[in-house]
Regions:
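Core SAM-dependent methyltransferase catalytic element
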Residues: 237, 248, 252-262
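SAM-dependent methyltransferase
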Residues: 137, 157-228
């Protein structure tokens, strides 16, 4: 994720229903424990998990994203309420800059240790983060690391988008999004059968009283998986399919995979 883009990510994601998404996740996360949030971005789900009494390790490749997440958590911790200081205390979370295909969790909240592998109760990976992996080989590494980082009978929940997203969003490979705070122009190009490039020009209004905008440019590459391949692959890597689901509120082209470690 581009450093500049991290600075305005929350403006860009302002209209996402985080609470609705979080409530969807909580259908499968029943008991308190430790959660790994892979590709945590600016920490919106971390805030909600901490509020509900979980311990959380947030992992992201963008240092700038993690800096924003840290500021959000600190703001919650310093709001003056004793309960908030406890829920959002530094002993309840850890933010780690790392690629999710390489990450091995060593954060042991219970024993206050950080020197050996510590398996989590749950792993979540939201907003089609797995589609930003380069190819199926990287997805295999991701699944293997998740298996290593997860307790037996623990749950891994991630979502992936299908080819349909490009028909859903782009008309003639262009998508225009105009909001009071910004205007964005998305351009889509298919690089190969499963690889797609998306270039985003984002214009953020500097002041609501004038027409001065600041321009940001972001280039993203998505790899699209065959859902049947995902199901077969994870079953061969120590997981069972607990459920698969879609939620029209988050787009028909998005599939949620809920896996249980054997």
């Amino acid at each position: 994720m581009h450093k500049q883009f991290a600075e305005i990510y929350d403006i860009f994601m302002k209209y996402v229903d985080y609470d609705g998404w979080y409530n969807f996740l909580k259908r499968f996360i029943k008991t308190k424990g430790t959660i790994l949030d892979l590709g945590c971005g600016t920490g919106e789900f971390i805030l909600r998990f901490l509020e509900d009494g979980f311990s959380v390790v947030g992992v992201d490749l963008s240092e700038k994203m993690l800096e924003v997440a840290e500021k959000k958590i600190e703001k919650k911790r310093l709001n003056g309420q004793k309960l908030s200081k406890e829920k959002f205390g530094k002993d309840k979370y850890k933010l780690v800059k790392e690629n999710i295909i390489n990450f091995e969790n060593t954060v042991d909240f219970e024993n206050n240790k950080n020197d050996s592998l510590c398996q989590a109760d749950y792993i979540v990976c939201n907003f089609d983060t797995v589609n930003y992996l380069k190819d199926e080989k990287e997805f295999l590494k991701f699944i293997e690391k998740c298996n290593k980082n997860l307790k037996k009978d623990g749950f891994l929940i991630f979502d992936a988008v299908t080819e349909d997203i490009f028909e859903e969003i782009f008309e003639n490979d262009i998508f225009l999004d105009e909001e009071p705070e910004y205007t964005s122009i998305w351009r889509h190009e298919q690089l190969s059968k499963r690889k797609h490039l998306i270039e985003i020009d984002l214009f953020i209004r500097e002041n609501e009283n004038d027409n001065l905008f600041r321009k940001y440019n972001e280039i993203q590459k998505k790899f699209i998986y065959d859902p049947e391949w995902i199901i077969k692959t994870v079953q061969n890597k120590g997981f069972e399919i607990f459920d698969t689901a879609s939620n029209p509120e988050f787009g028909e082209s998005r599939i949620f995979f809920i896996l249980k470690k054997l």
